[in-house]
Amino acid sequence: MDSHMNNLLKWSIENSVPAQPDDPEQVKQERSLDRLDTQALQRLLSNAPSDADLMKAAMEVVSDDFATLENKLIAFDNFEQLIENLDNANNMGVLGLWTPLVEALSDAEPQMRKMAAWCIGTAVQNNEMAQNKLLDFKAVPKLLSLAKTDPDTTVRRKAIYALSSAVRNHQPSLDELQKLLPADYVSEGEKMNAADMDRIDAIMNKLKEIPA
């Protein structure tokens, strides 16, 4: 650490405990503030990574063949928390993060498939832009397959969560799902409505009832 950063760190530690109003040390602290190297402070703040940087870094770990499963899952968890923010979820397309995320649905490790479905569900929930992206990447068939046939129950549940989030109030996604559902899920001639929450709940509950 250079001398400017050292001075900044020392000042921040000294000022972490406020002095009493009539404490003579107060004068010293106020003077130290005046002497603070503002350039060092700017460098410290500018070095903080943006959410976009953190998202890309997390997905790089997820996609790294040499990363441990533990580190991949930690990265996935961090990624999921970041995309709870609507703007971050919408930036996934610009950052090129949808491709590796959808690919992770086919990972051999169940925990990775689960986290991929979880992240998709978080990204598309009440988010038309992300719902459109999911359609662009043709992920609805894969999610339905996981929901119906994955041998891991936790993967099935997260896939159902992702489907549920994808189709609510998004008619194109629901139309895509309806085309793929077995005949006993939809009445002949029925046109499901993406705004009909009860009907969507019924579909999701039926998927949950499929035996493992």
UniProtKB/Swiss-Prot annotation:
Classification via InterPro entries: ARM-like (IPR011989), ARM-type_fold (IPR016024), Hsp70_NEF-Inhibitors (IPR050693), Nucleotide_exch_fac_Fes1 (IPR013918)
Protein's UniProt keywords contain Protease: no
Keyword Calcium included in the entry's annotation: no
Keywords from the named record: Cytoplasm, Repeat, Translation regulation
One Pfam family cited in the UniProt record for this chain: HEAT_2
GO BP annotations, alphabetical order: regulation of translation
ARM repeats: 26-67, 86-125, 128-168
Cell location: Cytoplasm
Chief subcellular location: cytoplasm
Membrane-spanning ranges: none
Record's GO cellular component terms: endoplasmic reticulum
Gene Ontology MF: a single term: adenyl-nucleotide exchange factor activity
SUPFAM superfamilies: ARM repeat
Function: Functions as a nucleotide exchange factor (NEF) for Hsp70 chaperones which accelerates the release of ADP. Required for fully efficient Hsp70-mediated folding of proteins.
Family to which the UniProt record says this protein belongs: Belongs to the FES1 family.
Protein name: Hsp70 nucleotide exchange factor FES1
Organism: Coccidioides immitis (strain RS) (Valley fever fungus)
